[in-house]
């Protein structure tokens, strides 16, 4: 009996260690946004739905562990872009979600030629895609001109994407059948991706709830737990506030969605925030000189710094838990609103298209 117990203990320990040693899964989203003259509505939808998309991605798990989320942004079809095919990288894959928001809010439209094959080709060439077959790799391209325009054959690019395990998902801004005629459906199915059509001029309704004011106030308290460090720290801290305001200006509901993101592990700012960086590598932070640190940590010894940082960490965790609790109540409220017959038949928009297909493809990769 004793030997059996020891054997079971060893098997359990090995299984635990194997689970611990498995690398954290990744979800990589490349957003390719048509920025030609008629696409102002599309850009507004992308800005409005960013935090809903991030919340959906961060809810995916494998063995109870959330994935690392990385998002890249391109705009194309804008005549102000110097590239011969009117394609521009706004940000490579990044986990800095404030940067993603910043880039989306900076997008502007201008007349130009929309070459879908060219922007997909660029995204496959320039972005650092994961080579792990277990990771979820997704391209979302949205626009309203024929998919086969331009010098790059989308079919050949689609073959490359499929061979790398990248799903190309297409979002046509217009009538469903028109998108089919203009090859947007074929542009998706050729890589086993999903095809959607949306009304890009439809405004995203930010449904207010009784919980939004509390969540927004907690978000302000959450911001006080962030302590900058390094050359870009102050700028990054200021940008956090700017992106809060950008979300709030779109509606209290969207501000609440952003606050929920900030309560999760997906919102990690180890590149500029002392608390996140300390958790990743405490030695690095404790070795920084005073001119690289905020006033709260200047002139302090290692033990005192660690004490202050840990106190901030505990306060942050407490606020995040409160935001998550209120967000659950908010979700219940919204589910009741959405069950109302008056809200039946709501059509897809940029965000729902992304979230539907992301969930579908995630299941194929073993995510829950």
Where are these regions (language model features)?
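Divalent cation-coordinating acidic motifs and surrounding scaffolds
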Residues: 21-202, 209-212, 283-286, 290, ...
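Alpha-helical protein-protein interaction elements
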Residues: 8, 68, 85, 218-221, ...
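A post-motif C-terminal structural segment
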Residues: 185-285
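Bacterial Sec-dependent N-terminal signal peptides
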Residues: 1-24
């Amino acid at each position: 009996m004793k030997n059996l117990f020891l054997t079971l203990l060893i098997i359990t320990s090995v299984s635990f260690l194997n689970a611990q040693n498995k690398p954290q899964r990744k979800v990589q989203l490349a957003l390719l946004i048509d920025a030609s003259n008629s696409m102002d509505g599309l850009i507004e939808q992308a800005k409005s739905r960013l935090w809903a998309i991030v919340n959906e991605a961060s809810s995916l798990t494998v063995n109870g562990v959330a994935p690392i989320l990385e998002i890249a942004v391109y705009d194309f079809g804008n005549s102000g872009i110097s590239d011969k095919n009117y394609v521009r990288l706004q940000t490579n894959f990044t986990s800095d979600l404030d940067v993603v928001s910043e880039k989306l809010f900076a997008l502007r439209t201008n007349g130009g030629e929309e070459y879908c094959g060219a922007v997909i080709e660029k995204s496959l060439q320039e972005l650092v895609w994961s080579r792990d077959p277990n990771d979820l790799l997704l391209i979302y391209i949205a626009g309203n001109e024929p998919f086969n325009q331009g010098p790059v054959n989308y079919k050949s690019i689609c073959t490359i994407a499929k061979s790398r395990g990248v799903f190309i998902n297409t979002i046509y801004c217009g009538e469903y059948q028109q998108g089919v005629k203009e090859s947007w459906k074929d542009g998706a199915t050729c890589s086993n991706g999903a095809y959607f059509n949306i009304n890009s001029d439809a405004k995203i309704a930010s449904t207010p709830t009784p919980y939004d004011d509390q969540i927004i106030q907690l978000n302000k308290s959450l911001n006080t737990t962030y302590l900058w460090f390094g050359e870009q720290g102050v700028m990054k801290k200021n940008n956090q506030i700017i992106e809060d305001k950008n979300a709030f200006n779109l509606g209290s509901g969207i501000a609440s969605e952003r606050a929920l993101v900030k309560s999760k592990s997906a919102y990690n700012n180890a590149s500029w925030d002392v608390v996140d960086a300390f958790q990743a590598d405490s030695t690095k932070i404790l070795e920084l000189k005073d001119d690289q640190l905020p006033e709260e940590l200047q002139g302090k010894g290692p033990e005192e710094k660690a004490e202050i940082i840990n106190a901030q960490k505990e306060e942050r965790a407490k606020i995040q838990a409160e935001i998550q609790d209120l967000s659950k109540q908010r979700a219940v409220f919204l589910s009741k609103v959405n069950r109302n017959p008056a809200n039946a038949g709501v059509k897809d928009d940029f965000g729902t298209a992304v979230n539907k297909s992301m969930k579908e493809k995630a299941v194929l990769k073993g995510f829950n």
